Amino acid sequence: MLLAPQGRSFSKKRMGLNRWKRFTRKPSPKPTFGPDSVEHWIKRVEKASEFAVSNAFFTRNSDLPRSPWGQITDLKTSEQIEDHDEIYAEAQELVNDWLDTKLKQELASEEEGDAKNTVSSVTIMPEANGHLKYDKFDDLCGYLEEEEESTTVQKFIDHLLHKNVVDSAMMEDLGRKENQDKKQQKDPRLTMEMRHKQVKENRLRREKELEYQRIEKTLKKSAFLEAQCLVQEEKKRKALEAKKEEEEIQREMVKLRREIIERRRTVKAAWKIEKKRQEENSQNSSEKVMFQSTHILPDEEKMVKERKRKLKEVLIQTFKENQQCQKRYFAAWHKLILDHRIKLGKAGTLSDWKIQLKVLRAWRDYTRFQKLERETQALENDLREENRKQQLATEYNRKQVLRHCFTEWQHWHGAELLKRELALTKEETRKKMDALLQAASLGKLSANGLSGISLPEEATAMVGPPVKNGQETAVPPLWEKPPLGSSGCMLSPPLGRTTTGNLQGSLQNVSLSAPGNKQHKTLGAEPSQQPGSNETLRTTSQKAEPLCLGHFHNRHVFQQQLIEKQKKKLQEQQKTILELKKNLQLAEAQWAAEHALAVTEAQSHLLSKPREEEPRTCQMLVNSPVASPGTEGRSDSRNSLSGLRRKPKQLMTPHPILKAMEERAIQRAECRRILAEKKKKQEEEKLAQLKAQEEERQKREAEEKEAQLERKREEKRLKKMKELEKQKRIKRNQQLEAIAKEHYERVLLRKKGLEPWKRLRMQSKQNIQVAEEHYSLFLQRKYMLTWFQRSQESLARKMAQADQFYSQILLKRVIQSWLQYVIDLQEEVRKFCVHFLQKKIFRAWFNMVREVKIDSQGKHEIAAEHSDRRILWITLRTWKKFVKFMKEERVKEERRQQLRRKVVEILPDFQVPGRYHELYQQSDTWSLSKTSLVNE
C-alpha cells in the first residue's frame, strides 16, 4: 500500500532534480555543474575565500597581480604550509557539514512538491550556474543580492497565486476542483524526456552487461580449454613415462637373464676344463711311474714301495675327502629336494582344499538361491491368494450393502402401501357416512331401515378390518424368503431385525464360497440364541451399517499391511540372491587368479634351476603324479567325510595357510638375499666380462646352438607339465562330479521319496478329520431341526413386537433430528451474519486508514518544502551578513593600514621583515573570519 506513493515521490524527486539540465545547456564548451553536487559547492567556497583573502591581504602590494589564491601565494616556509593546510581543512569541514545537512533534509522528504514548486524550480534552476560567470567578489555579491530579490518576488507571486480567494464550499459548488487538478498536472514532456533517458541508460547498461558476460564466457571457455589441454598433455606425458619405464624394466630383465645364462655357461666350461686337466695329470703321473719302475735299482725298491704306499694313502685320503664332500653336497641337495617336495605337497593339498571349499560354498549358495526362489514363489502365491480374498470380501460387502438398501426400500414401499389403503378406506367410509346422513335428512331412513341399520355396521366392519388386515397382510410379504434361484443375492432380514448376532454371523461367513440354505439357517438361528436381550431388539440399520463397514475397514487395513510386509520380504530376498550371485562370481575369479599364479610360480621356479638338476626335476615331476593321486584321494575322502565327522587331531594342528605364508616369507627373504649376492657378483663380473669379450665372440655360435637345444628341452618340459595339469584337472572334475551325483541322489531320495509320502499321510489325516466334522454337523442338523422350527415361531412372534417398538423409536428420532437440524441452521445463519458484519467493518476501517495515510503524506511533503525554503533563506541571509562583514573588515583594515603608516612615519624602522608581517596579517584575518563564521 505504501510502496506506490514512495515510488512516485522518488520519481518526482528525480525528475525535479534533473529538470534544470534542459534549461542550463549552453553552446559554450565550458563544463556545467549541478547546484547539488559537492564539487560545485567546494569550488564555489574556495573561490569566495580566495577573493576575500586577495582583497583583504593584497590591496597594498601593487607589485603582485590579482590572481587566484593558488597562483599568488608562494609558500616558502613549513609554518605557512601547515597554516594553509589547517585553514583549508577547516573550511572544507564546514562546507561538508553544511552539504551533509542539506542532503539529509532533501533525502528525508518523500516527494518533492506538486506543480507549485515546479514553476519556482524551473525559474531558479537555470540561474544556478550563473555565479561561474563572475571572476570578482563584488560582482558575485551583487549577483547574490539580485538572486535573493528575485526569489523573494517569486515567493510573493507564488503566495498570491496559491492563495484561496474563494471558500471551499463555493469551490465545490462551482466545480473548481477539476480545474485545479488540471492546473496541477505536470508537463508530460519532462516525463517523456526522463523516460527516454532512462531507456537509453538501461539499454547501454544491458549492452555493457551482455558484453561483460560474453567476455567472461570466452575467458572461462579459453581457460577451460587450456586446462583440458594441460591435463591431456600431462596424461600423455605420464603414459609415455610409464611406457619408457616398462621398456627399461624389460631391458633390464633381458640383461639379467643373459648374464645368468652366460654365468652358467662359464661355470660349466670351467668345470669341464678342470676335469680334463685332472684326467691328464693322473694319466701323466701313471705313465711316469711305470717308466721309472723299469730303471729302479733293487736298492731303491724299498723307497719306491714307500713312495707308492704314501701315494696310495694320499690318494685314499683325497678320495675319502672327495667322497665326504660329495656326500655332504648330496645330503644338502637331497634335503632341499625333500623340502621342495613337502612344500609342493602342502601347496597341492591346500589348493585342493580351497577348491573343495569353493565348490561346497558354491553348492551352498546355489541351494540357498533355490530355496529363496521357492520362498519368493510361495510368497507371490500367498499374495495372489490374499488379493483374491480381498476382492471377494469387497464384492460380498457390496452385495450386503445392496441387500440392506433393498430391504430398506421394501420397508418404505410397504409403509406407503399401508398409508394408501388406509386413506382409501377412510374415504369410502366418509362417503358412506355422508350418504347415510343425507338419507336420514331426506326421510328415507324409515323406508330403508334395515339397510340403514346395516350400513353403519358395514361401515364399522369396513373401518376396523382393513387396518388389521393392512397390518397383518401387508407386513408378512416383506419377511417372506425369496426364491433361491431367482436372484444371485439373498435378501437380508428387515431393518428392525438387524442385530449384532446377525452382523457377526455375516462377517464370519464371508470366507465361504457358496452361501446357500445353510447360511440362511445360521443367519436365522443365531438371533434366537439371545431372545431376552433388549440390546439386540434396539439395534437399527443406522448402527448396523457402520459396524459392518468398520470391521471391513479394519480387515482391509490389516491386509494392506500384510501385503506391504510381504513385499519388503521379497525385496530383501532378491537382494540376498544378488549378493550370493556376486559372491559366486568373485569366488570363481579368485580361484582362476590363484590357479594362474600357481602356474606362473612353478614355471619361474623351473626356469631358475641349473641345468644339472633338469633330469632329476623331470623325474620328480614324472613321479609326483604317482604320489599325488593318493594324497588327492585321501583329501577327497577326508572332505567327503568332513560334513559328517571331524577328527579332534585336525583342530590341534596349525592351519596350512599359515604354514604356507611363513614358508613363502622365508622364501622371499632368501630370494632377496640371493638377488643381493647376484647384484654384487654382477658388478664384479662386469670387469671380467670386458676382458673376456674377445673369447666370447668365438664361443657365441656354440652357445647359440646350446641355447636352442635348451629352449627345445624347456618347451618339451612345459608340454609335459601342461599334460600333467590337464590330467589332474580331469581327475578332480571326475571326483567332484561323483560327489555332486551322490548329493543329487540324496536330494532326490529326500524330496521325491520321503516328503511326498509325508504329504500323503497328512492329507489322509486331514480328510479323516473333515469327514468326522461333516458327520457331526449332519447329526446336529438332523436333531436340531425340530428345535429350530419352534425357535423360528417364537422368533417371528418376538420380531412382530420388535417391529412395532422400532417404528415408535424411529418416529421419536426423526423428530429429534429435525429439531437439531433447525437449531444448526440458525447457528450457521448467526455465524454468517457476524462474519459479514466483521468484513464490512474491517473494510471501512481499512479505507479510513488509507485516507489518513494519504493525508499524512501530503502534510509531510508540505513540511519538507517549508524546511527546504527555510534552509535556503538562512543560507542567503548568512551570505548577506558575510558580505557586510567583509566590507566592514576591509574598512577596518584600511584604517589600521593608515594608522600603521602614520606610526611608521613618526617612529623609527623597528618593524619585522616582510614575510613574517604577511603571515601575521594572514593569521589575524583568518582568525577573525573563523570567529565570525562560527558565531553566525
Curated annotation (Swiss-Prot):
Superkingdom, according to UniProt?
Eukaryota
Which intervals carry biased composition (Polar residues)?
497-516, 527-541
Question: Where are the stretches annotated Disordered?
Answer: 495-541, 607-656, 691-714
Alphabetical list of InterPro entries matching this protein: CACF_protein
Answer whether the UniProt record assigns the keyword Coiled coil to this protein: yes
Q: Does the keyword Coiled coil apply?
A: yes
- Entry coiled-coil feature ranges: 189-270, 364-440, 554-592, 662-739
Q: What keywords is this UniProt entry annotated with?
A: Coiled coil
Q: Kindly provide the name given to this protein in its UniProt entry.
A: Coiled-coil domain-containing protein 191
